[in-house]
Amino acid sequence: MESKPSRIPRRISVQPSGSLSARMVSGNRGTSLNDSYHSRDSSFRLDSEYQSASASASASPYQSTWYSESEITQGARSRSQNQQRDHDSKRPKLSCTNCTSTSAGRNIGSGLNTLSDSSWRPGQVPRSSSMVLGSFGTDLMRERRDLERRRDSSISSLMDYSHRSGDFTAPAYVQERVPSSYSQGARPKENAANTLQLNSSTNHQLPSEHQTVPSSRDSSRSSFRSHFSPRQSESFRNSSHPAFSYLSSRNETPTISSSERAGSSQRPFQESSDNEGRRTTRRLLSRIASSMSSTFFSRRSSQDSLNTRSLSSENYISPRTLTSQSRNNGASSSEVNDGRASEASQGFRFLRRRWGLSSLSQNHSSEPDAENFNQESEGRNTGPWLSSSLRNRCTPLFSRRRREGRDESSRISPSDVPPRSHLFRRESNEVVHLEAQGDSLGAAASRPQASGASGNASASGSTPDLPQGGRNTGIAGILPGSLFRFAVPPALGSNLTDNVTITVDIIPSGWSSADGKSEKAKSAPSRDPEKLQKIKESLLLEDSDEEEEGDLCRICQMAAASSSNLLIEPCKCTGSLQYVHQECMKKWLQAKINSGSSLEAVTTCELCKEKLQLNLEDFDIHELHRAHANEQAEYEFISSGLYLVVLLHLCEQSFSDMMGNTIEPSTRVRFINLARTLQAHMEDLETSEDEF
């Protein structure tokens, strides 16, 4: 299956040390790092420079190793090149002649079958796709240490040792590399540096100064140590010899880059990536803000919230102090943060818009002091000082609100609105009364709301535009006859200029005065004196009725209703327990008899323990008690007789079972005869009771 096409095709040219020509790697983006494998380059060519340089180092293991790997036939070279072309179109591969690292993967068969070196077998390579084998470099280091002790040995012994060292299992030299795969949730640590190295190495060749050949054993040892360190991502720190490291970028395309490039350009890329991320976030938030600003604030919700807020806060005066120092600080800070906060402020201005009514009266003045002061405070309403971009973007919203204001004003007749005196209170507690109509005052008003999150106690305000009253006619139509409270800075005295930042509080018409007395205090329930008098009389009548009620039944707590149900005194109880209705007493005595109480308990008062003196018509307590006793006796006898019949039947059945003479028809006949006998006996008892 072919891999997905790359977003940015890259062509990387690598010229490592040793003058061994590396192939041009044309890498496409793989799906994950586990699918990106190193393929061992089988087309090693050993030129004259390397032969002379390696010959200068006596007893060097490079001679035997490189010569054994260079003895590859031309057919093998062409075959490996063809296979490499086929695989280059499927996934990215790296060819590094210094490392010659091999990994198991999907192309393990075609990449390793072309090798003629006897120390490397395809069967010895582990089949783990998440590991990178650096066996050759580690093998060379161990051979170097052992061959320094055996410098006097011949080349044949070196060849023999190389074959013997090839018998070691390949997993012993597996380098630890954490696979970076998006499917496993892992991300490479050097994201910024790796992405920069991708961009810098695209269609670019490394400088030719990296083509130096290691000419001594110390230099080759240090270069191989830097090449095959356990963590190859840190290999660019060794700058004595060109060290190439395998780095995984964010889009998981394997690259080979130089250490000097990675070290020099890592910091500016991080800054550029951070700035790009900020800009992208701001643009996204600005789009969301512009799309949601038209739906968050409607005129009806603004009016409801305005009325609720005005009634809940009593005598609320929001001071606004605007000095020259604060304006200078606001201007300087806005110049510094203009580029950074321009997009964010446009995106979040609608979140700081406390009251939607201020949008009706837009003051299109463009004083720089007002704009800077607006950017300086976080909890400020941005209605009067909206930027041109956001104002043009929200033009349909403002026009719709103006149109709704005109419709509202047309519905309300001016004759119903009485003239009110608008109270202007400055911060210096000087009160000025101005007589004006509600519809002639063209002042933008916004209800301040404290910003608890930022700790800014100052609330938003709007600049009055008194000369241009025709622009702000909508607010007068929506809130006719309202009381406007202005908070003016004390340093300005009585001068009200156009560039003064003040706070306007809209007090509904229900408020009677500006001293904090709400409509609740005014509209105290003043009842009609006639109604109050009637209520008092009814209460007095109830009290008198209770006093005049007299005797009540101690069972039903009611007075004598009729002559047939009179109150009687059955015992010596006094007070509220003295009297009782006749019907209530009958029901009570019947309940006591049915409960199975004795005759003495029925005829005795439960409270005073005296004998009841009853003279009730058609109610004989003794007869009722005797009848109930007879019923109880019959019930008990029947219950006992049935019990005996069942017991006798069970005994007879068990006896017949024991004797073995069980005959079902005869047993049924006996049971029927026993039942008849019991029934006859009960009839005899009933007749005897009737005779008595």
UniProtKB/Swiss-Prot annotation:
Residues 1-165, 201-280, 296-343, 360-425, 440-474, 512-532 are annotated as: Disordered. Residues 61-83, 95-132, 201-214, 235-272, 306-336 have a biased composition (Polar residues). The modification Phosphothreonine is found at T687. The keyword Ribosomal protein does not apply. One of its GO terms (cellular component) is nucleus. It catalyses: S-ubiquitinyl-[E2 ubiquitin-conjugating enzyme]-L-cysteine + [acceptor protein]-L-lysine = [E2 ubiquitin-conjugating enzyme]-L-cysteine + N(6)-ubiquitinyl-[acceptor protein]-L-lysine. The modification Phosphoserine is found at S318, S389, S688. The keyword Zinc applies. Keywords: Acetylation, Cytoplasm, Metal-binding, Phosphoprotein, Transferase, Ubl conjugation pathway, Zinc, Zinc-finger. InterPro entries: RING-CH-type_E3_ubiq-ligase, Znf_RING-CH, Znf_RING/FYVE/PHD. It comes from the Eukaryota. Pathway: Protein modification; protein ubiquitination. Its EC number is 2.3.2.27. One of its GO terms (molecular function) is ubiquitin binding. The modification N-acetylmethionine is found at M1. Gene3D superfamilies: Zinc/RING finger domain, C3HC4 (zinc finger). It is found in: Cytoplasm. The RING-CH-type zinc finger domain is required for E3 ligase activity. PANTHER family: E3 UBIQUITIN-PROTEIN LIGASE MARCHF7, MARCH7/10 E3 UBIQUITIN PROTEIN LIGASE FAMILY MEMBER. E3 ubiquitin-protein ligase which may specifically enhance the E2 activity of HIP2. E3 ubiquitin ligases accept ubiquitin from an E2 ubiquitin-conjugating enzyme in the form of a thioester and then directly transfer the ubiquitin to targeted substrates. May be involved in T-cell proliferation by regulating LIF secretion. May play a role in lysosome homeostasis. Promotes 'Lys-6', 'Lys-11' and 'Lys-63'-linked mixed polyubiquitination on ATG14 leading to the inhibition of autophagy by impairing the interaction between ATG14 and STX7. This is E3 ubiquitin-protein ligase MARCHF7.
